[in-house]
């Protein structure tokens, strides 16, 4: 993941050369809303959508499926970096068959508020965590099954550390930010000097600045860099719906993106690695770690968590044929595995 983030980081930031140009992205909140509507149009299940207002004038964009099944512990979905609720389009219908499912855009991403985040990694992380807790209070949820992908997995773990009584089961899907950067990382995987130099030059800029600088060419850039997303959602769309959604999610004001940058060190590693803190987590919180068998992510975090929590429930599941975006690569298998986990709760 570190390598993938850094490559994207460097490629996109070439746009800094043209940073004197005015913003010229053909986007708006209305464009993002319309792109999200297209992502969700194939979902037959009924659902509620609303802004949930939290302190400091912020609001969290929220989707709720099967609200009438409130007798079971609800499943709450946290998306990854650069994502939004629309990327769960392949999962909602299956997951909400037997229980309520909530999905929301993380603070600073998607259609949620995009406030200023602290430049300190600890404080930025806490802002994310507190926004999740404030959302939970406003939604009136006593306990939840918390599932997070990528950055969402990191934040789900951080939330569980601070508010353990609210989490019935923690599901980490290809989580970012768990291992610390090894001292010999550069020796095992040598990084060319020119890349280090480029990274130093570009360090003041946000990871996706180049996408915004690209303006009307940004959508083509998304399509060129990530053609795999069209294939992942081909059962639902045969056009550029997914690329349009990702584009409009990420050319708005870079709020959560800036927070993420401030939580990382070269080259994509977390400043405050989660594995260092996992032993402090309440021993009664069950954890399931889900990885794609074909993922470029190091899957050792699951076994490391097991060794760090010898007296707690920890299970690792590998989804065959799936990469980092497990929920989209093999949605049927992923959905069934998550439903099985939820059924073990109640």
Question: What does each model-identified segment do?
Answer:
Residues 83, 123, 127, 329:
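Residue-level signal for the nucleotide or nucleotide-sugar donor/cofactor binding architecture
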Residues 82, 106-110, 177, 295-296, ...:
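Alpha/beta-hydrolase active-site loop signature
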Residues 52, 62, 76-79, 88, ...:
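Generic structural signal for small/hydrophobic residues in well-ordered secondary structure
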Residues 49, 101-103, 316-318:
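Conserved beta-strand scaffold positions in the cores of enzyme catalytic domains, especially
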Residues 285, 311-346:
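Catalytic active-site module of serine/aspartate enzymes centered on a nucleophile-bearing elbow/loop
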Residues 1-47, 122-130, 137-138, 142, ...:
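Flexible "cap/lid" subdomain of the alpha/beta-hydrolase fold that forms the substrate-access gate
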Residues 91, 159, 337-341:
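Hydrophobic residues on the short alpha-helix immediately C-terminal to a glycine-rich phosphate/catalytic loop
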Residues 58-117, 139, 149-155, 162:
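Conserved HGGG/HGGXW glycine-rich cap/lid loop of the alpha/beta-hydrolase fold
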